[in-house]
A protein has these predicted regions:
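Internal hydrophobic alpha-helix adjacent to the cofactor/substrate pocket in enzyme cavities
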Residues: 172-175, 301-327
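Active-site-proximal substrate-binding core of FAD-dependent oxidoreductases
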Residues: 313-352
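FAD-binding core/adjacent interface of flavoenzyme oxidoreductases
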Residues: 1-3, 75-165, 172-176, 245
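C-terminal auxiliary extensions adjacent to catalytic cores
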Residues: 339-379
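FAD-site-proximal beta/loop scaffold in flavoenzymes
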Residues: 121-145, 238-306, 310-314
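Glycine-rich, N-terminal phosphate-binding loop of Rossmann-like dinucleotide-binding domains
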Residues: 9, 96, 109-110, 235, ...
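A Rossmann-like FAD-binding core segment of flavoenzymes
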Residues: 32-36, 75-88, 92, 175-270
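Beta1-alpha1 glycine-rich phosphate/pyrophosphate-binding loop at the start
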Residues: 1-76, 156-198
């Protein structure tokens, strides 16, 4: 029997496990393949929905499903966080002390926010990357009466267009609640334009200007002074705020940083086409966990998962890998309360954001409902 072990029960891990169960359906039914998923939690969270939770536009319980209900019934599922990954031998030790062995290992441990890496940021800034953070931001917005709003972007971070989305949605929120005239919005970004991807920056900059949103580029956050309500950059720029929102810096999982050689910042050194751990053709990396210099997004995880599913199933059935990952990424961009845009790109095609429309916004809302089919690997 061949054993496939998936570390991580998020979008990437769920799609890989479910996709392999379908591709290797006959082998599973005949007892030739065993698929196991280990996770730190028994709940599956739709992370993009946290952006809507921060504005009170979705109920929190709509963002969760039981992880066991997401997975194919034949997949073994254990809530037992990994504490050590032995990539050389494809073994994983968990918090309970159990050691899981495998023939093929998939590492899909995701990323974590690190606001604590910048003095004062955790204490002063709101963020929407965790349920607690989104809830706190929602509640604080209800009490906000206007003033200086600063959206502070740090790198690296997941969801490439999240900084643009939160800024435009905040603008519409203030307008809808008659607070725009009493407020001033400033957006900070660490490089010399409003987004790392130049075509996105070229699209967003005039949108900001049209809406009266100030942009402070080359702003690498040094610290936040809660006493004076000031955020300070390494370059020496100081901005006053009454309401501070941050896109916090991210790192990969601690277990990856501790276990995998060369995994600086918790990002695994990954072959950009075959998606295996460099030097290990039977250990695959999916989603935020890779160190590939492309956007960390749900769609990235999905497209990578499709490649890994094809390659592992082909290795099992034919002894060879099936195809390459082309770097494809697709992201919706919420441009306000009622309009949306999108952007897609890959290793050879640069992004080119479309014009915001109500139709794209509605499609995004529809996808929010259909996400669970994606996690099950049905979309």
């Amino acid at each position: 029997m061949k054993k496939i072990l998936v570390i991580g029960g998020g979008m990437a891990g769920s799609i890989v496990a479910n996709g392999l169960a379908r591709k290797l359906n006959k082998e599973m039914n005949n007892g030739l393949i065993e698929i196991t998923v280990i996770s730190a939690t028994d709940q599956h969270l739709y992370q993009p929905g946290l952006l809507y939770l921060a504005f009170g536009r979705v109920r929190e319980n709509e963002l969760y499903r039981d992880q066991k209900d997401i997975l194919d019934k034949r997949i073994k599922f254990h809530v037992d966080p990994a504490v050590n990954i032995d990539a050389n031998n494809k073994k994983v030790t968990t918090e309970s002390g159990k050691v899981y062995e495998s023939d093929y290992l998939v590492i899909a441990t995701g990323s974590r926010i690190m606001p604590q890496s910048i003095p004062g940021l955790s204490e002063e800034a709101y963020q929407f990357y965790t349920p607690d953070g989104a809830r706190e931001m929602r509640d604080a917005l209800k009490d906000f009466k206007g003033g200086k709003v600063v959206i502070n972007v740090n790198a690296p971070h997941k969801c490439p267009v999240a900084p643009i989305e939160i800024t435009l949605m905040l603008h519409d929120y203030l307008k809808e609640n008659d607070l725009l005239e009493k407020s001033e919005i400033t957006y900070t970004y660490p490089v010399g334009r409003v987004h790392a991807m130049e075509p996105v920056a070229n699209w967003a900059a005039p949108e900001f200007e049209k809406l009266g949103i100030k942009a402070e580029t080359l702003f690498n956050t040094k610290e936040v002074d809660g006493k004076t309500k000031t955020i300070i950059s390494e370059e020496g720029t100081k901005l006053k705020y009454d309401f501070l929102v941050t896109i916090p810096p991210h790192k990969g999982a601690q277990v990856v940083e501790d276990s995998i050689e060369g995994a600086k910042g918790g990002w695994c050194p990954t072959d950009k086409k075959k998606l295996y751990l460099e030097g290990k053709t039977d250990v695959f990396i999916c989603g935020d966990t890779t160190n590939i210099p492309i956007s960390k997004a749900g769609s990235t995880a999905h497209f990578e998962a499709d490649t890994i599913i094809d390659n592992i199933s082909s290795l099992v059935q034919e002894g060879t890998m099936a195809r390459d990952y082309d770097g494809k990424v697709f992201c919706f961009i919420e441009t306000g309360k009622e309009t949306g845009s999108y952007v897609w790109f890959n290793y050879t095609t640069p992004p080119n954001p479309g014009l915001p429309t109500k139709a794209v916004h509605r499609f995004k809302l529809a996808y929010n409902k259909m996400y669970w089919l994606s996690a099950k690997g049905l979309l």
